[in-house]
Amino acid sequence: VGKEVEVDAICDGTDVFVPGIMELVERTGVHSGDSISVYPPFSISDKVKGIILHYTRKLGLAIGIVGLYNIQFIVDKNDCVYIIEVNPRSSRTVPFLSKATGYSLADIATEVILGKTLKEQGIFSIYPEEKKRNYVKVPVFSFSKIRGIDSYLSPEMKSTGEAIGYDDKLNRALYKALQASGLKLQNYGTVFVTVCDKDKEEALPLIRRFYNLGFNIEATSGTAAFLKANGIRTRKLK
């Protein structure tokens, strides 16, 4: 368990360019295409960023990649960085990162493949200064249109599209992205909750936030008893 982080990079055989590091919101184990991605990363340290850049450069040169590649990492609670996978190809996050950073990664990578180095294209730093604005990519799902699909997120990708939001504030960027994805975000109503025993304590702060915002809480018997014991008025569903 940890934070999942993703990079798209370009290697010309001598130098490496990483236009941005993306932090994923969902837990590890959810397919990266079904996870919310945020650039610039919002909770990893400069030390971890340095390790990620070091690994990205070392892997690109060792494998002998010329062009685009994608690496997914896990960062644990002790800031140890682990590699999930390396993909020697373009990825679905290239358009998002191109829009967020202003670098046309497809154009740069094409020039590299044709023999023009990164330095010849005016790129001298492995990692440019991060943008001040927040960019968020959210998945778009079609569960209401495609029958028989389990909506539980897993390593199997289930999203059918993507949407982007950006703003100076991260929470507003996320709100815009969710709106763009077609979600109707309510500021009132009822939240149904059912949580297994091992996750109840972890889920409590989130449920309490909904409760404090004025949402009605409904839950299955075990979850309802737990919430009532923690001061959250809950309607038990039978």
Question: Language-model segments: which ranges?
Answer:
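Short hydrophobic/aromatic-enriched beta-strand-loop microsegments
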Residues: G231-K238
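A general structural motif
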Residues: L170-K176, V195-D199, I217-A219, K238
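Glycine- and Gly-Pro-enriched alpha-helical subdomains that act as flexible
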Residues: L183, Y188-T190, V195-F215
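Glycine-rich phosphate/ribose-binding loops and adjacent secondary-structure elements
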Residues: A203, A224, L237
